Amino acid sequence: KLRFRDLELVKEELQFFLDHNVPQVKFVDRTFNCKHDHAMAIWKYLIAHDNGITNFHFEVAADLLNEEEIALIRTMRPGMIQLEIGVQSTNPDTIREIHRKMDFAQVSETRVQEGHNVHQHLDLIAGLPYEDYDSFGKSFCDVYRLRPQQLQLGFLKVLKGSFMYQAAPEYGCVCQSREPYE
């Protein structure tokens, strides 16, 4: 079950960062924009209280961004936010197997950066189930065609308690028992 932090508390915390000219604040929950009203309230607050310095990094599900959210994002000053989009893979079998939901066709249609004010980086992960050399190459080309400012390649981390941790023996995964769990 998803929990959402009280908006008034979030605004107080954000104001602290803004008042202290913190260079960057990261929201590292990929479900940030799963609740439209919550995301919009935070983004509107940031626009209204922008200090011209602080950059906010959001992990978002691009296939969930709607036109109202995209329109609001396009009003932000250049450099105010950056979006990280965890594609992981464009192989539907892989996405299904790792219990993710993502509509890559919808991600491809989402045109946040047409406003030229948002830095976007898209992530891929090497080593996922059903992802071989050719499949990963296709995922890379699919994401590269979207022309993000940054394409980040990560290696599979098998975190304790995760689906991949439990399924590691089935896939023959060998990983470190200590950080970074690669």
Question: Can you describe what each PLM-predicted range is?
Answer:
Residues 36-37, 93-98, 126-134, 146-182:
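Flexible glycine/acidic-rich beta-alpha junction loops that bind and position SAM and/or redox cofactors
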Residues 1, 108-132:
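Mobile, glycine- and charge-enriched loop segments
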Residues 67-73, 129-147:
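Catalytic cores of alpha/beta
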Residues 1-114:
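Radical SAM [4Fe-4S] cluster-binding motif and immediate context
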Residues 23-24, 119, 149:
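Residue-level detector of anion-binding/catalytic polar loops
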Residues 30, 123, 154:
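Conserved acidic functional residues
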Residues 43-44, 139, 168-172:
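Short, hinge-like loop/turn segments at secondary-structure boundaries
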